[in-house]
Amino acid sequence: MADKLVATLDKAGVRKISTDLWGVFFEDISYSGDGGLNSELVQNGAFEYNRADKPEWSNYTAWRKIVPAGSFAAFGVGETAPVAEENPHYAIAEIGKVSGEQTADSAVSRADSALSQTDSACTPAAPALENLGFDGMVFRAGETYDFSIWTRAHGKALPVQVALIGDDGKPLAATVVTAPASNACGEWTQLRAELTITSAQAAPQPNAEIIATQGALRLIFPEPGTIDLDFVSLEPRTTYKDLKHFRPDLVEALADLHPRFMRFPGGCITHGLGLNNMYHWDRTIGPVEHRPHNFNVWGYHQSFRIGFYEYFRLCETIGAKPLPVLPAGMSCQNTSQGPVPVAQEDMPAYIDEVLGLIDFCNADSATNKWAAKRAAMGHIEPFNLEYLGIGNEDLIDDVFKNRFQQIFDAVKAAHPEITVVGTVGPAPSGQDYEQGWAYAREAGIPIVDEHSYQSSSWWFHNLDHYDHTDRKGPKVYLGEYGSWDTQLINGLSEAAFMGRMELNGDVVHMASYAPLFAKNGHTSWNPDLIYFDNENVYRPYSYWVQQMYATTTADTAWPVSLDGPTTLRRDLPNTVSLKIDGGAHADFADFSLETADGTHIDLPDVSYQGNGPVSLPVPEGLAADSYTIRAKVTYYEGMWGVRIASGDVNGKNYNGTSLGRGFSVQVVREGTGYALGG
């Protein structure tokens, strides 16, 4: 007799589904910001790169110095009377001699005829600085590029030839700007120009003809003299619905997801690596020159060209509600010595900073200073903020509760209309999760932010994760989640779980996949929802799953019970192997493995330095259905903790015991294949 499956509709259990269920989360990870969503083509245009970003980086990273034979030029770095004290470094070009010296008139003539003088223009006769962009600059036929630069010429006016250089080293477009005379401590002048790459077949669209993929911006100095340079910028003029400073094809990929909300800026970016790296929203608005740069927790640089104002404009353009996230007065817990709080004496000022964001979004620009700044940037009407996230993956201890409660109470008192989203740690289980939920219930936090990065098998095995959530307690925002790969099985596992989130849409109020963007060749995390390079956008299976749910929304869920065979049993491999990985430093002593039949294997001590997987010498072919691992572990420091993987560690299914992250122990079953997917 064939198996029979009976489905029964539970009419009494009808539930309303949140109208804000499906959204997106943008964090500047994997070059998502500068070099990604930010349309700026110049890398390190403010000359602020330094060793805090990467040990090998300096003020001239991404710049190439060109000094032709017969010329003399020295390129230095200054800090005297800068354009902006927030970003004090600038380039100094000291041009002592130019081979075949030119005048300003000859520089203009050279720019006018640059396209016909292709051979000589490959190597300029005068000293030059050339910016290589982010993996090269893509130039498109018919596109107009807006150029700007701050200059300070010492003693006399000096011309600067500006050229867009193609893959073959020849100019595609050129012009000349002239810096007026000043002095070493004098006034700066911002110069602007536009450069258009002409073509009879041109159309200034994101898919216009690409004529260079490894292009560059070249600044040529045709006359002797000294000139200071800062905040060099080059942006294509094409936009998505007039949204400036954003790469249009990436915005289009976001808009096509039809997100109900967008979370920003993080993630770990929010509270940073230490208080000096903490994200302060008010330092990311106003003139870009006065937005203090900082290192990025993911290993590069943040210019904050896409700051909070640009974020709100992006939300407005794609029809998503903003969900800004601010630190809970704590730095990130994923550092060697754990989180550091904002000092109590500084908490009143920090609370004012939090309240200021709400005013920036919602207050009347005629009566509020923060709203007046919004209006000065071009947006008189409010942004209609509804949600505010406080904290991210925090260690839920007494200090966190103290700082969070102060902020939470202040927001409730000043703005009862704002829905606060709290945090319950980095995983859907463990100490932070349990304590976070307990505190959220006690404090009456409206929504809590859960995170869950898991194997495909975990999602299939935990479809009931929200079935038994307390309907009278805080609602859930699954703010970061994803299945560990980009294969079809991963998209299917996410789709299955999203269906159950929709079924529980009365308590799961919001959800967003993470991370959102990743630039090929610069991935800090994998998988991601949208991959890109300088030319194209790539959408893996998970993207289409997100789009499917967001474009086929429901408002009511009817629970269904199933009677009959609903699972398929698959045997798991019983291979026994061991490895240690993770980013922390730890010593393993008295290491041993014992199987259920009494086989005892002594393993060598390991001093793990956090620099890659270390395999343990387990006898080849060892197999067991159950076994015990013993070790004395001394944990020192490092990001993300350390993990002992056991089982079929080179296959698709194994166990992982993680130590140190949040100063706790977590045991999970890892799996990327069908064996754990049933």
Regions found by a protein language model. Give the residues of each.
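Alpha-helical scaffolding within the catalytic cores
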Residues: 3-11, 70-79, 245-249, 305-311, ...
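Hydrophobic faces of well-ordered beta-strands that scaffold small-molecule active sites
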Residues: 20-26, 262-264, 322-324, 386-390, ...
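Extracellular and organelle-lumenal recognition/adhesion modules and their flexible linkers in secreted
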Residues: 1-303, 321, 336-348, 386, ...
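Active-site groove signature of glycoside hydrolases
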Residues: 221-222, 230, 265-268, 325-333, ...
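Substrate-binding cleft/loops of secretory-pathway carbohydrate-active enzymes
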Residues: 333-342, 349, 377-382, 425-457, ...
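Active-site beta-loop-alpha junctions enriched in small/polar residues
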Residues: 27-29, 264-269, 327-329, 390-395, ...
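Conserved, mostly hydrophobic/aromatic
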Residues: 24, 47, 149, 258, ...
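Catalytic-core region of carbohydrate-active enzymes that cleave or remodel glycosidic bonds
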Residues: 314, 409-412, 416-419, 437-442, ...
